């Protein structure tokens, strides 16, 4: 899948910030000059962190490439700021103390596994984001999450189950579907400051 250039990644982060600012101010934000890649369907997540402590402040996204990237980014950035049920809505003035991180996702692919041990072999911490499905339960963790928490593969899978509202050993004891994806990450180092691509 075609990756974003660094300039396109910067555009995504800046767009997300302005989009949130406009939404919180009651202003409709429209972009006229759009890089072509933003018209292609992509999955995307917007993650907000407090600055400088870098505590999670909101994270919502659209994992599947079901709409043009610009539309997914518009929806995810607003949702991360006001619709994450774990946090109160972000205030307009508070946004000055928040950094924005954008993850552009590859389409999720089913991890083929004949036994739970196969997951330990096929999933790579730091490369793979994961989605687990079991019945009506579904949970997702971005690839940067286990790195931030220093999890090994077993801890990663256990926490993936917890994210879905399942017991930690569901991936071992039940017939689940686990999907993997990769992400290209662009983030601010400080609020409205320098933007970098995370390698």
Curated annotation (Swiss-Prot):
It comes from the Archaea. Disulfide bonds: none annotated. Pfam families: AMMECR1 (PF01871). Gene3D superfamilies: Hypothetical protein ph0010, domain 1, Hypothetical protein ph0010, domain 2. Residues 7-197 form the AMMECR1 domain. NCBIfam families: AmmeMemoSam_A, TIGR00296 family protein. This is Protein Maeo_0138. It comes from Methanococcus aeolicus (strain ATCC BAA-1280 / DSM 17508 / OCM 812 / Nankai-3).
């Amino acid at each position: 899948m075609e990756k974003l250039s660094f300039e396109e990644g910067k555009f995504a982060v800046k767009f997300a910030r302005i989009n949130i600012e406009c939404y919180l101010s009651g202003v409709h934000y429209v972009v006229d000059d759009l890089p072509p890649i933003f018209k292609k369907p992509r999955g995307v997540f917007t993650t907000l962190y407090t600055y400088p402590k870098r505590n999670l402040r909101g994270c919502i996204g659209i994992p599947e490439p079901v709409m043009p990237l610009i539309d997914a980014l518009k929806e995810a950035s607003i949702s991360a700021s006001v619709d994450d049920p774990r946090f109160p809505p972000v205030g307009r003035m508070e946004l000055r103390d928040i950094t924005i991180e954008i993850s552009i996702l590859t389409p999720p692919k089913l991890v083929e596994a004949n036994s739970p041990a196969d997951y330990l072999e096929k999933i790579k911490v730091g490369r793979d984001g994961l989605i687990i499905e079991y019945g009506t339960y579904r949970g997702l963790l971005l690839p940067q999450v286990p790195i931030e928490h220093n999890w090994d593969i077993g801890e990663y899978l256990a926490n993936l189950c917890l994210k879905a509202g399942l017991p930690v050993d569901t991936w071992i004891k039940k017939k689940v579907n686990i999907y993997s994806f990769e992400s290209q990450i662009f983030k601010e180092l400080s609020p409205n400051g320098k933007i970098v691509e995370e390698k």
